[in-house]
Structure formats: structure tokens, C-alpha cells
Amino acid sequence: MATPLAVNSAASLWGPYKDIWHKVGNALWRRQPEAVHLLDKILKKHKPDFISLFKNPPKNVQQHEKVQKASTEGVAIQGQQGTRLLPEQLIKEAFILSDLFDIGELAAVELLLAGEHQQPHFPGLTRGLVAVLLYWDGKRCIANSLKALIQSRRGKTWTLELSPELASMTTRFTDELMEQGLTYKVLTLVSQIDVNNEFEKLQRERGLGSEKHRKEVSDLIKECRQSLAESLFAWACQSPLGKEDTLLLIGHLERVTVEANGSLDAVNLALLMALLYCFDISFIEQSTEERDDMIHQLPLLTEKQYIATIHSRLQDSQLWKLPGLQATVRLAWALALRGISQLPDVTALAEFTEADEAMAELAIADNVFLFLMESVVVSEYFYQEEFYIRRVHNLITDFLALMPMKVKQLRNRADEDARMIHMSMQMGNEPPISLRRDLEHLMLLIGELYKKNPFHLELALEYWCPTEPLQTPTIMGSYLGVAHQRPPQRQVVLSKFVRQMGDLLPPTIYIPYLKMLQGLANGPQCAHYCFSLLKVNGSSHVENIQGAGGSPVSWEHFFHSLMLYHEHLRKDLPSADSVQYRHLPSRGITQKEQDGLIAFLQLTSTIITWSENARLALCEHPQWTPVVVILGLLQCSIPPVLKAELLKTLAAFGKSPEIAASLWQSLEYTQILQTVRIPSQRQAIGIEVELNEIESRCEEYPLTRAFCQLISTLVESSFPSNLGAGLRPPGFDPYLQFLRDSVFLRFRTRAYRRAAEKWEVAEVVLEVFYKLLRDYEPQLEDFVDQFVELQGEEIIAYKPPGFSLMYHLLNESPMLELALSLLEEGVKQLDTYAPFPGKKHLEKAVQHCLALLNLTLQKENLFMDLLRESQLALIVCPLEQLLQGINPRTKKADNVVNIARYLYHGNTNPELAFESAKILCCISCNSNIQIKLVGDFTHDQSISQKLMAGFVECLDCEDAEEFVRLEEGSELEKKLVAIRHETRIHILNLLITSLECNPPNLALYLLGFELKKPVSTTNLQDPGVLGCPRTCLHAILNILEKGTEGRTGPVAVRESPQLAELCYQVIYQLCACSDTSGPTMRYLRTSQDFLFSQLQYLPFSNKEYEISMLNQMSWLMKTASIELRVTSLNRQRSHTQRLLHLLLDDMPVKPYSDGEGGIEDENRSVSGFLHFDTATKVRRKILNILDSIDFSQEIPEPLQLDFFDRAQIEQVIANCEHKNLRGQTVCNVKLLHRVLVAEVNALQGMAAIGQRPLLMEEISTVLQYVVGRNKLLQCLHAKRHALESWRQLVEIILTACPQDLIQAEDRQLIIRDILQDVHDKILDDEAAQELMPVVAGAVFTLTAHLSQAVLTEQKETSVLGPAEAHYAFMLDSCFTSPPPEENPLVGFASIGDSSLYIILKKLLDFILKTGGGFQRVRTHLYGSLLYYLQIAQRPDEPDTLEAAKKTMWERLTAPEDVFSKLQRENIAIIESYGAALMEVVCRDACDGHEIGRMLALALLDRIVSVDKQQQWLLYLSNSGYLKVLVDSLVEDDRTLQSLLTPQPPLLKALYTYESKMAFLTRVAKIQQGALELLRSGVIVRLAQCQVYDMRPETDPQSMFGMRDPPMFIPTPVDRYRQILLPALQLCQVILTSSMAQHLQAAGQVLQFLISHSDTIQAILRCQDVSAGSLQELALLTGIISKAALPGILSELDVDVNEGSLMELQGHIGRFQRQCLGLLSRFGGSDRLRQFKFQDDNVEGDKVSKKDEIELAMQQICANVMEYCQSLMLQSSPTFQHAVCLFTPSLSETVNRDGPRQDTQAPVVPYWRLPGLGIIIYLLKQSANDFFSYYDSHRQSVSKLQNVEQLPPDEIKELCQSVMPAGVDKISTAQKYVLARRRLVKVINNRAKLLSLCSFIIETCLFILWRHLEYYLLHCMPTDSQDSLFASRTLFKSRRLQDSFASETNLDFRSGLAIVSQHDLDQLQADAINAFGESLQKKLLDIEGLYSKVRSRYSFIQALVRRIRGLLRISRN
């Protein structure tokens, strides 16, 4: 080699061969379309390997040196850079391996490296031992590939139905191999390779490990030899070998010997069959088109030389090592010659064809038939290959049909021999030695050949020439070897042979003839013909019946003989007292007769086993009465062997239920097993005695086994409950007791002459137990003692046998102990991997033991429940606990471990592994047991390793590896595939249930997690890394990975959908569980790239298994959701991004690197045709997944019943429903079947019996309906599950993944596409309503995100605009682009307005589709609609105080902005739906589910707010819904009252109330709405509600706001405020809106205030000050300022008498006084003024609290000032008669600077009016506040315009006030968003405060001016002598008069007498000081800064001027 020596890490002697075998399998067996091309490539590449079959690379000096130095210099490894140093040990091993197999040194190194890599697959083996396995596995793969390729050739015997291209390719390839001498190589290898020699070599070099390793190596070597031999066999079947090759084969067979048991081994059998097929010309009889081609290929017919050579070779007199083998070949040759001679144009071959007789004679002389029987047919491998059977069948039938003279000769010879024997016997001589027994051997061969029929071929049918035409299906299948319809002539000859041989049958061949018939009767139709033959044989001799003459082979003869024996033996029967009778010789029957009887009994059994008609016909025959005679004979003294056969025949009869029922009674009557003890009888009788005395002594137990077999058959056919009634307690118990105590419990201690019989006994008795327990269903009556009368006394009847077995298995009984001990012995035996006698029976016995435990586990819960309810004094213990018990032999609790060890034998004994897995799955549900099991499983390192290997091996088992094509495999293979599959399912279910238990649990151990440390610290690795074993997790990933490297996707998803579904579920559970999530996801991400490689292939498509497919996708999507969430949290952006691209991209990706086009190519071209603009787009994967969920669901046809009542059937079905493992409610079909059948069985009378078949048919209809219904439920559940998972994935993508990974525009497009698709699917008429809730949920999330995305985009656009036109720019800029028609994306959002409208329409359609029901679904949809409508809402804009600069004209003429346009279109679309939509929403708002009502109200709120036409308001009023809502307030009252208790019930009512009030408030904002509400009496309703009077006492500690953060449930005070504030807001809004009806509104509100006056007073007293109480005050003062005014009383349309008028006036007066009192608290220098500065170190959420409090306090001041102004204006039309609310004292400003202590009391006594000083103080305070607010506002605006430039600390601080926790975890972009949000809030708060300050200033100035004007100009000072008295009386009366203007002619001046001149002078002087220059300048500055644009122009200036003027006037 010129290339440098490099090592192939996959081992060139193994990896490539494994690959060839895989490719061959894909092409030939799995029929994968793309595999043909790959196979062609690989065959061309590896042709030399096939030509130099099994040839190893030779040793080589250069390589030797290279390896020698590898520890220092290293070796290069293919596909890896650099070199790798090899350890010395490995180099040593490589040289040993090189010598051992005579292979090149590098090849040895490769094997060892591959061994090291594969080591995890072979736990417990070293790399050297694994290398040995790999070496032979490579050989096996190449041999198997060769065999498969040859099997796929075109040829004469079979076809695999492959494509012509593939068949031609393999035929051509194998032809080339044959030309290179394949036959010679194969025969040489078969001779050279010898297991024993190989083992000796390996043994010498310590190349053999454990028993399992030895077994595996020996199996591999045997398989190599066998596959090579079978390659030749397959070749010969398809196209015969040439002359040289045939001679080589003959030469090989000459030297062959037989095995120890006399049969040929598998290899030589295959080679013999190959040679026989070379001589096979049976295909000529076919009429296929290809026949002529084949004839030309057949050297037998075309080459004279071939015939001559072979003929002379076979005529050669030299003996072979096996003369019988030589004879077989000669016979085949003779028959071939005879066949050729019958063809036309063969005269040239006459010299050979005439020698056929002589050749056949030679064969017969060498006992050909005996050899075929003893060495060929008996071989265990013979029945494993269908074409062996067919070839021997052809051989025999050809002989019988083509050589009739020979057959006649054989018969004549037999007759002659029989005569000689007869004469010898008569003369008393020994029979002559020279006798030939050829005919006898031929018959026995025929009997043996057809005795088994594994492929259901029923080839023996050819021997029966039917008198009537047979209605057979085509039995021969698609094979070409045998004609579908034999020529009748052949059949005639064969059937003649069968009949004639029975005529005048000589006694010597009587038994062989019967055995032949027994073989020929094997099969349903054959049995029928044989029965007829025996019937006909007897009938022709009816006349001489008395002599028992007639044909000895007839029913007549046989049953007559039986009767005679019975008569004869019955007379001989000694009395019961004669104890010794059993030991007398049985005089009745000679050995010869016994053999004959046994042969006939076996024939009878065969016939009646197959043919039910024969069974019934024989049984019902009046003269023969076989059952009676057999039972009679069983009571006689005959040998046990004969008794056994009689019992077996009875068992065959017992297959029919009608016969079985009577058989039970007969058995009981004849006491075959003694069940009744007669007191006078000293000696026990029956089978028990036979077992104990005769069989035990002989150490053979045929009778016991036969008896068990009989019982086994009978319990299956019919089970009598009252067996033995009248003579003993009725029931099966005596039989069960005998089987349990005498047979089962003692089977181990008995002696056995034949070792295998021990296990046969165990198997057959355990089978009975299994059947009894399988058919037992615990019933309530089993647990009640049933009394029966027996001979005049009451006795307890026996329990059902199932009950008894359950009781024994749920206790530490000998039976359970023996069963467990048997399991232990079984697993020990299997661990030896050695054959032993009775192995098959031991395996069966173990299987029954495991099945018994399984059944017990399944039934124990019901059994124990019923036992608990009953009065029975029985104690049982759950089996899972018993299994935890101590094993008496090992003194350990290892029972479960023993059961689990069977999984280790899953490959060799799949049934045992299946039962074991089922038991483990059953007991794993209990978490306490889990912990113990983990301990038991991990206690011993070697056992732990084995158990893990067992589980992994069962999961790994690849049936596809065996290439069993299910449609062509045998029944057994299909069954095993199903069992292996079920085992894997059970193991996965075990993992799933275990994962739900707390750690430590079995699943964690099996999946490779830490058990001794915390689970989350596990570091999962690939197998072999850091000593990590191969675990179930690796096996599961392996199952799912297969196929992900190609374009088809995971193979398991298609081929074993249920398995794949559970695998995905396990992985999801691991990812979802907090302990296992971290390690699992890390491992899947780093080592496997699992999710990406799996998600590529979504959606899966598998219509046939839709349920599994949907669940697979569900678990995978859920796992993907977790992965996206986790990677997003951990900031693993690249991982997140990769998955997002995969799911969301609409650009095609090419995942295939090797030039195979991606799947999307076709899509691209298709879409290219359809949409020219999106030519390169493909459908997003997330949408494809949605497409794959079919929303429509077929519903089964309703039941049509004739007999049963439909309603009752529905009821029964409902009663049979239960929750399955997945939590779906399905009907238990088995239980339903039992109930219905019991119902039918209960019917009495003839009519019922006649109609039974019809009733059963109807039951079948019901069951089919229920199965359909279950499937429907499961399918809907799966669809819902898939849709939920899809929704979860979509939600995670939108919420959890970093926003910047999806561009804003793409984000909107994605949401739009998903929304449109999901709507289209659910709005389809076929869509299942059950899916609506999930879809609605998804729509809600999607709309929320769409709304967010669009609004974010709007904000971002706005941020880019210049600072001045901040928001105006954004609103106007949209109109600079061209109109929408030209540019589709212009408009509101990236997705364009039209898309938004479509979404809105679909949402509304969806709402209407839900109709009356589905309110919860609509709840989601209302939420979605609200989010959608939010898009058209203007975002919070910062009030920069700039916008107002525009003139009114500019504002009126501004173009419509995007928000208004969208809003207008939205409302137009909503209104186009008319009353239908209104009706649905209004109905939901009024009744139904609370959340539904809240959302419906919110939606109404939103729509009414934008509905300019007021259509909805009109509908609400006219349809009465508004009135209903208003009236419901009174109903809410009581519920709300209950919410004020300290521990409230649910707060739902509160939230519903808040929603309702919010909606009513929204309605009240519209003038028309306010009028409607007044008309509906909303305020009257509020006045009636008592809840407002239930104001809770506040906690004094909560002064100045709550120090403790509030809990989730608000305190009673907060709850009360949540109830009161909406009512106050509603009143305020109504007062504001109802301008036309203002007085009416004010009157009603006043009544509301008065009816709750206590509460109102309490609020006005304002005992504690908190944000909440200030809010209340702010609202209340606002209402009072508009409602409690003079003149309102006169408008009240109530008939008030004097007294009530006084009362009302009193209330109003009190309100006034308290309001004015507030001024001194909030406007004065009181410490409340300092309230806002109390808490300097404010934290996040307290910041906004502080803002709220500040705002509320300013609002209160503003409201009180407004009230003062209103009182003044309304009460005093002229200045001269002004109402003075303030005394002319300015002392307030002076004397109130110090803090006061009595803040709890009202500050101003009610008799004292506040002085004007408070106004001045407020004015100054407000002016100062204004400037601080103004600065703060300006700073915030500039910060907002430059957020990105702010220092990080400031940004953080801003964020914290919005989001107190977790600021550090969010991205910078998100921090900016939060900071902006906070700044906008601050700006708007400051803007409001500025507005309030400005208002307060203006009002203060106005009031000051009015008072000063009055005092300084119009007031007449009085003398002050009685000022105190005057002030007390006059002020009081004046205030009342003022308030109500009740007496208009009141002389105001009289009230002013109390103001002295001194007061006035002091006032003027103080005022001049207080209202100084600085204050005036401030006020004018304020106007300049603010009031110009905001309010009355130069109002402040005018007032200041006037006040200044007033103060200048000198008073004289």
C-alpha cells in the first residue's frame, strides 16, 4: 500500500460488513426505495470481500513493526487528525489476536479499538472478548448478506417480489461470484470452520469469557457455517448448480456423518437439500411464463454431459460414510431421471433414464426411507425451513406417483414377509433375520413427515382425492415451487395408495399404517377425509359385525374392539378389598395389542383434535359411545401408558364445550379422581393412588400428565360450578387440591427416570392453574359462604378455584414459595446457557409461574377490596409485599431480583422477559416498594450490572435486525416480534410510573442517574465515557435516533409508533422533573443534539396510527418548549436561535449535506407557480405541525338495536366506563362483553334459545360501537394533547425567548400567519368542538402578543421622531407614504391594516360559532378581542405641555391619525355583525361564569367607549340589559357584605362588581348614557345598598400608609375601599356628564350621600391618613363640591315637610362645615402638609404611593376650593351681598407654623369659620409647589428624550419603581422600556399636579379677591362690645341662610356687625405684607409658564391687579 498505514476505528473486519448487512436488509427486507442505489454502491465497493469470502488480511512485517512502536509513535486513525498512542497492553492483545485468527496486525488493533468502543454494549466483557465477538459478527454479516442476496435471485422456486431492477442487480452480482468459484469456497469454509476447534484455540488464549460469551461466540460461528450452507441451498433452489459444483457438493456429502442422536446437523441438512433441489424438476409442471427460460437453464435437461457425469458418480459402488445419505441422493436422482423420461424429446438420454429403476432399487436397499425418517425429518432444523418440507414431500409423492411398480413391489414384499413371520410364530421359531421393512419405513416416514405442520401448508391434502370438490383457499401462496393445483392424476394415484395399503392389511404393517394415517390426518381438511375413510371402511362390512370382522382400520372395528376389551376386563376386575390387584400382571391386553390400541387412540385424537364434526359424530354415535367405553376402561386394571392415551383422547373430545360439560359429570361419576369418600371403603381408589403407588415406583408419570392435560382442556371448554352436587359439597376444589397438593407441591421431590419429565409435569399442572386464574373474576358472592343441603345437613359449598388460587398466592403458602423457588431455579438454569433435558418445558413452567404472579397482581386490588367488605375471616397480603419477603434458600430478599433477571434472557426467551417486565411494571406503582427495589437491585454490583444490561438489551432488541418480514414470517416469528415489542412497552411504562415516584426510584437507576448523591448532580455521559454504563436512556435515544441521519426521519415513529410515543414521553418527563431536568437537557444538548435532529422531521405523518403520532409530536413539542425556556433563561442564545429558526423560518433550509435535495425543493417549485412574489418561501414548520392535527373527527354511527333497549345499553356502557392510564374515560370492552353475555345467558325459555345467535350478533354490534367510541375519545384526547403542546410551544416562543431573536416585523408576520391558520381550522364546519377551548386559549395568547408587538413597534417609531413633535410626529408621519393600494404594508403595523381586519373578523366569527354554550371559550375570545382593540388605543403619551400650543383650528383640520382610522374601521366591522354579536356579549355580561362576565363587561366597556354612533348603548338600553345590570347591584349587596368579614369567602364577587361598576362608569361618561343610567335609577340602587354603611374600623398602626407589604388578600379596609370607590367614581362621572339633567343628578347623588351619611361623615373626618383614605376624600370632596349646593333642595321632587327639610339642611350644613374644615388640614401648615415627606427612604413601589398621595392631597384642596367658589357664586348674586366663608383674619399664616398634636380631632371647631389666612397660605404653598413640580416635569421630559444617555444607576432606580425585584436579570433594552414607562408616568403625574396647582392658585386668588373686596369695600364694621355673643349667633344663622337661600330677603349686613374696624385694618395691613411683591411675581411667572396655554388667559394677572388695587385703597 502506498498510503500510510491508518487504522479504521470501525474495524475493517467488522464495521463495513455490518454496514453491508444493514444495506442488504434495507433493500431486500425493509424495501426502502432509496436503499437499492446504496446497495449497488456498497456491493461494487465490497465485491472483493465476497469473492475472497472470509479471507483475512495477512500478517505483515511492516504492520508488525508499526504496531510494535505504536506505544511511542502512535498510529494514524482514519478520519482523525494526528496519531494516537496505544497502551502496551493493547499492543500485546493485538499480537495475540493476530495469531489467534491469523489476521494482519493492524486489523487486530482495529478490532480491539472497535471492541473498546462497543464495550458498553457488552457489560462485563473486556475489549479482547468483545473483539472476538466482533470478528465473528463480521463473518456472520458477510455470510448472511451472501445468503440474502442469493435468496433474492430470480429463479424457479420462489420470488421475493422485489423490483425488477433490484432482482437483476442481485442476480447479476451473485452470478459473478459463482463464476469465481463460490461453491468451492463455501464447501471449504464449512469443512474448515469447526466450533470445537475454534473454541480450543480461543480457550488457549483466554479468548472466552462468561457462559453468555461462550454461547454468543458459538452461536455466531454456527450461524456463519449455516448461512454459508444455506447460501448454496438458496442457490440450488433458484437455479441449479453446474456440473463441477454439483460434483463438489456430492464429494462433500460423501464425507458427512450424523450427530449423536442420529440426525443431520443444520449445515449438512442444508447441503443435502441443496443437492436434492439440483435434481428437482417439479417446476416443469407449472405453467408460468418463465418456465421455458428455466428449462434452458437446467443442466439436467440440457446437458447430456452433466447427466452422464452425475449418473456415473452416483452409480459408483464406493460407499459413503452415511449409506442412507447416499441412498437419499440416489433416490432423488432416480426420480429426476424418471421425471425426465416422461418429457418429450429426451430419447438422447434414454441410456440414463432407463437406469432409474436400478438406481431406485439401490436406494431402497440402503434403507432410504429409514434414513430420511431418522436423520432428516427428525432433525430439529428440518421443520424450520418450508422448502425442506416441500422437497421431501415432493420426493415421497414423486416416488409414489412415478414408480407405482416399485410401490407394489414393496407391498408384495411386505405381504410375503408377514406370511413368513406368521409361519415362524406358528412353528415357534424366531422370525428370519433377512426380512426387509421398507414399506413399514415408508409409512412411518410419511406419518412422521406430516405430523407437524408449522407453516400450515397441509401438504398431506394431496393424498386425499376428494369425492366432492374442495373449497380451499390457495394454500401454496406465491411460491413457484409447487403447482397451485396438482394434476388430478397424481392425486388419484396417491389417494389410491392410501386406500389400497389399508386393504387386507398384514398385521406387521398395521401400526405403521395407522401412524401414516395419523400424519396424513394432520390438518382440518385432512382430518375430515381421514374420518370419512375410517367410516367408509367399516360400513361395507356391516353384515359380519358380530364377529368383529371388517377392515381392521375402521371406526367400527376399533370401537367394537374397545368394547370387547372393556367387557373382558370388567369381568376380571377384582373386588375393592383385594389390595394386591394392582400388582397382578394385566392379563387382558398383550404388548402388541396395547401398541395397536395406542396407535389407534393417537390417530383418533389427531382426527378429533382437527375436526369438530368428527368429534361430535363419534361422540353421538349410539353404538360406539367412545366416551363411555374409554371411561369404563380407565376404571379397569390396564397399564398407565394406555390409560394416559385414553385420557389424552378424552381431552381431544373435551375440546367441544357440549362434550366437555357431560365429560365433567362422567368424570365425577366414575371417580377417576376420588372426590367422594365412602365410609365403608377402606382403600382409596383412583388416579391419586396410581400416582403415589405405581407411577412413583416406576419413576414415570404419563398418567398424571395426561390427567392434567385433560383437566386443562376441560377447564377451557366448559366449567361447571355445581360439580358433584348431591354427593359432596359442590365445586372444583377436590380436583384443584389434587393438582396443587399431590402433583405440584410434590413434583420436585419425586424421582424421574427421564429427567425432562420433571419439567413436563410442572408445565402441565401450572398451565391448569394459569387457565383457572386467567378466567377468574372476583365476584361479591365468592366472599359469602354459600350453604347447600347434603344428606339432610347444611354444608358450605366450595369456593371457585380462582378464589382458592388467589388466596394461596396472596399468602406465604407452600404454593407461592414453590413458584418463587421455581423461578429462582429457572433463572439459574438459563444462566448456564447450556442445553439440558426438558429445557423447553422448564421455560414453559417458568412462564406459567410468572403469568400466575401477573394475574394475581392484576386481580388483587379487586379481590382485597371485596374481601374487606365481606365478613370472611381470611387474611391476605398484597403480592408485591410478599415478593419483598426473604428467600429461605439465599436468606436474602431477592425474589423480585430473580424475576427481573429474566430480562437478561430477553433475546433467547422473549416470553419470559415479557412476563417479567409486566410484573415489574405492575409493582412499580408503589413508591415505598420502589425505594426497596432500588436497594435490592443495586446491592450486588455484578447483579446490578446484569439487571441493567437486561433492561437495556430488551429495549435494544431489534426485530428488524432479524429481518422478519411480518407478512412472510412464520406465526411464531410474528408472535415473538409482538412479544418483544410489548416487553419494551412495559419497560417504558415502568420508567414512566417510576419517574412519578420520589427519588430514589427504579427509573433513576435504570436511566443512569446518581442514587447516592442528589439526582441533580448527575453528569450523564455517552456509554463508555468515564466508565458510564449503557443505560436505558441510551437505549431510548438510540431507538429515536435511528433514521435521523437520512431524509425519512426517526424509523420508530413509523414502524413502532407506540414505542416511539413512550420514548418521547420518558424524555419529556426527565426534562420536566426538576431533579433530572438539568443533567438530561445538558446531555441531550451537548452529546446528542437530540431536539434539533428530531424537530427537523416534524410534523410526523402516519395516518394509520394517528393517536400515537399525535402523542409523539406532543411530547416532543413539550420537551422543545422546556428547552427553549431553559436556554433562554441561561442565555444560551445560539441554542435558542437555532431552534427558533428551525420552527419559524419560512426560507427553505437544506439539512442534507451530501447533495440529497431537501424535502422542501418540491414545495418551492409548487409555491413558485402559485405566488410569484413568494417564490422562495416555504411553510413555517410551526404551521406545518398545526396542519398535521386534523380538527375534524369521524363520529361512529349511532346504535341501531332490535333486541336491547338503547337507553339501557347506554346506561350499561356508562357503568362500564373507567379512567385508563392516560386519564381518559373509556369503556371497558371486556367488562361490557361479560355483562351483556351474562344478560343473554340469564334469559329463559325456548324463544330465548332460538334467538341466541341474533342476540350474540347484536352484542357484537354494541361492542364494535363501543370500540369505535373509545377510539374517538382517545383520538380527541390525542388531538387535544397535541394542540395543547403546540400552543405551549408557541407561547414559549413568544413569551420566554429573548425578544430580539425574532425581528419585530417577523414576529408580527408569524403571529398573523398562526392566528389566521388556527382560525381557519377551527372555523371549518367539520372542526370538533372539543378542540375549541385549546384553540381559544392559543388565540388569546397570540392576540395578546400581536397587540404587544404592534404597540412596541409604534413606540419604537415614536422614539425615533424629533423631540418637539415627539408624539405628533408619529401620528402624522404615517400619512407621508403612498396610499395603501400601492404599498400593501402601509398602515398601522408591519402586517398592514387589512391583516388586522381579517383577524378581527375571524375572532368575531369564532365568538359567534360558540353559540349559546362554551362560555369559557368565549372568555378567552373576549380577552383576545380586548387585546386586539387595545392596538387602536393611543399609548400613554407624556404630557409635555407642548401639544396645547396648537390653535383650535390646527387641531380641527389635522388629518385623521392611524389610531383613529383603525378604531373607526374596527367599530365598523364590529357593528356589521349587528344584534347577533351584541346579544351574545350582553348575555355573557349579565349571567354565567364570573370571569366570563368580567371580560364581557370589559369588552362592552371598550366597545361603548369607541362607538361614536352609540349603537351598542342604544341596544343595551332598548333590550333592557342595562336595566338588568343596574338592578343586579341590589343582588350584589348581600354578597359584598359577606366580603367585609376578616376571613372572606372567595373574592370573585368583588371583582365582578368592580367590572360592572367600571362599565357603568364608562356608560355614564357619555351624556346619553348618564341619562339612561339616571332613568334606570342607578344612584337610587346605590343608595339602597347597605354595604357602603359597613365601613370597617381602621387600624391605628396603619397611619401614614401601611408599613407592612399587603398580602395577596386585601385587608377588610382595602376591600371596603374597592367597593366604595367605584360607587363614588360613578356618582362623580354622572354629575359631570349629565349637564342637561344636572339638578336631577345632583339631587339623586345628594340622596345617596345622605342615605350613607354616617360613612360620608367618617370619611370627611379622615381619622387616619393613607393613600386609600385620601383617594376616598378626593372623590368625595369632588362629589360634594358638585352636589351639596344651595338650590338643590328646591329641585328635589320629594314632598318634604318642614321637619325633613330641616334634617336635609342639617346634613348639607354638616357636609359644608366638614369640607371647609378639611382646608385647614390639607391646605394649612398642618403636619399633614408634611405627610409626603414622611418617608424619605422610599423604595420601588412606595415611590408611586407617594405620587398618589401627593396627587390626592392637591385634588382635595382643589375640590374644596372649587366648592367654596361654587358656594360663593351660587349664594351671592351681587358683590354687596357676598357670602363670606372666611373671617377677615390672616393669622392662619402666622400662628399655624408650629406642629399641632391634636390631629385626630377636627381642626376647626364647627362654630368657627376659618380665616382668610388659610387661603393666603394655600396660595403661597401652591406657588412653591408649582415651581418644584415644574422643574421635576422639565427634567423628566429631557430624561425621556435621552434615556440612552442616562447613567446606569439612574436607569436601575427608575426600573425598580416599576419592577421592584429582578431588575438585574433583564436586558438593557428592556430596562430602557421600563425606564421610559416610569418617566412617562412621572411626567403625566407632574402635569396633573401642575394643572391642580394652577387651578388652586386661580381659585384662591378669586376667593381672596371676593373676600377682600367685600371686607374692604362693602363691609360695615360694628362696635365690638358684644362681639363674642354676636359672632356665636349671627355667624351660625347666616351660614344656614347662606347655604340654602331659604330666605332671600335676609339682611346680610346684619351679619357683619361682628367685624370691627380694627379687624379690617389689621386685615389690610396683614394682606399687604402677605401678598407682597415676591408672591405677585411668582404668580405672574406661573401664568407666563403655564396658564396662558392651559386656562383663562391673563386671569391671574387680572386678579393680582385687582387685589393690589384693593390693598392700596385707604379705608377711612
From Swiss-Prot:
Q: What biological-process GO terms show up in the record?
A: mRNA transport; nuclear pore complex assembly; nuclear pore organization; nucleocytoplasmic transport; protein transport
Residue positions, PTM N-acetylalanine:
A2
Q: Report whether Transport shows up as a keyword of the record.
A: yes
Q: Which GO terms describe its molecular function?
A: structural constituent of nuclear pore
Q: Which residues carry this modification: Phosphothreonine?
A: T3
Q: InterPro entries, per this entry?
A: Nup186/Nup192/Nup205
Pfam families this protein is in?
Nup192
Keyword 4Fe-4S set for record: no
How does this protein sit in the membrane? Answer: Peripheral membrane protein
Modified-residue entries (Phosphoserine), positions: S575, S1165, S1167, S1939, S1942
Going by the UniProt record, its keywords in alphabetical order are: Acetylation, Disease variant, Membrane, mRNA transport, Nuclear pore complex, Nucleus, Phosphoprotein, Protein transport, Translocation, Transport
Which locations, inside or outside the cell, does it occupy? Nucleus membrane; Nucleus, Nuclear pore complex
GO CC terms in record = cytosol; membrane; nuclear envelope; nuclear membrane; nuclear periphery; nuclear pore; nuclear pore inner ring
Top-level taxon of the source organism: Eukaryota
Describe, from its UniProt entry, the tissues in which this protein is expressed.
Answer: Expressed in the testis.
**According to its UniProt entry, what is the function of this protein?**
Plays a role in the nuclear pore complex (NPC) assembly and/or maintenance. May anchor NUP62 and other nucleoporins, but not NUP153 and TPR, to the NPC. In association with TMEM209, may be involved in nuclear transport of various nuclear proteins in addition to MYC.
Query: Subunit composition?
Result: Part of the nuclear pore complex (NPC). Forms a complex with NUP35, NUP93, NUP155 and lamin B. Does not interact with TPR. Interacts with TMEM209 and MYC.
PANTHER family referenced in this protein's UniProt entry, alphabetically = NUCLEAR PORE COMPLEX PROTEIN NUP205
Q: Give the similarity note.
A: Belongs to the NUP186/NUP192/NUP205 family.
Q: Which disease is it linked to?
A: Nephrotic syndrome 13: A form of nephrotic syndrome, a renal disease clinically characterized by severe proteinuria, resulting in complications such as hypoalbuminemia, hyperlipidemia and edema. Kidney biopsies show non-specific histologic changes such as focal segmental glomerulosclerosis and diffuse mesangial proliferation. Some affected individuals have an inherited steroid-resistant form and progress to end-stage renal failure.
Q: What is this protein called?
A: Nuclear pore complex protein Nup205
Organism this protein belongs to = Homo sapiens
